[in-house]
């Protein structure tokens, strides 16, 4: 049994971790803020640029009024407009850099054990935790090549798990594009809804 999605979570930038906002083993939602590295220098830059932006907007307004009365050249007006556009671009860049200091869940799932603490210096290669989407689960199995054409996409199958008496139902959704030349088998995947998240990935299933 395989998770529907799984990823090692890490930051897009480097910095000292100042927040960890998740409990190990808990369910998290897509977009949820999980952790954050220090962004104070970036916030200071943003505040400075926002202050400059207000002044630049005032200059453009005044220059436009003067231009309408032919009291200033077109070139002077275009210069202040360019300065305003540059400031807006700089603000967009800083805001993008600030967003990279935030680690957010890329999808709904269960977050595993954390590998860092507040105060840890993290880089893009630092794994914070693993995020696993366990609903649905993928059931991966292989059939001998002589049966490759017998298992169709959309077909249902039943499987059992060791230690559980009940039978689970999954639906085939994908087939490998070719026969494995070594094992002479075709790998097939089916989806089990796992709506209550009662079954964990990593277990071996017996296909009926």
Listing of model-derived features with the role each one plays in the protein:
Residues 41-96, 114-117, 139, 183:
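Alpha-helical coiled-coil segments
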């Amino acid at each position: 049994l395989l998770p529907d999605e799984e990823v090692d979570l890490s930051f897009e930038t480097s910095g000292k971790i100042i927040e960890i906002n998740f409990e190990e083993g808990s369910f998290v939602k897509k977009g949820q803020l999980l952790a954050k590295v220090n962004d104070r220098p970036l916030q200071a830059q943003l505040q400075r640029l926002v202050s400059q932006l207000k002044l630049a907007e005032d200059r453009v307004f005044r220059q436009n009024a003067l231009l309408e009365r032919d009291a200033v050249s077109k070139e002077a007006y275009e210069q202040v407009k360019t300065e305003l556009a540059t400031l807006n671009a700089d603000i967009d860049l800083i805001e993008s850099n600030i967003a990279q200091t935030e680690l957010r869940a890329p999808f709904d799932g269960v977050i595993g054990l954390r590998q860092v603490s507040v105060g840890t210096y993290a880089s893009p290669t630092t794994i914070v935790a693993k995020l696993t989407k366990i609903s649905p689960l993928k059931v991966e199995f292989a059939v001998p090549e002589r049966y490759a054409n017998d298992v169709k996409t959309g077909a249902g199958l039943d499987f059992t798990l060791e230690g559980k008496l009940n039978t689970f139902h999954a639906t085939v959704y994908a087939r490998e594009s070719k026969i494995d030349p070594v094992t002479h088998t075709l790998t097939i995947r089916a989806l089990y809804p796992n709506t209550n998240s009662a079954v964990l990935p990593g277990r071996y299933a017996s296909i009926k």
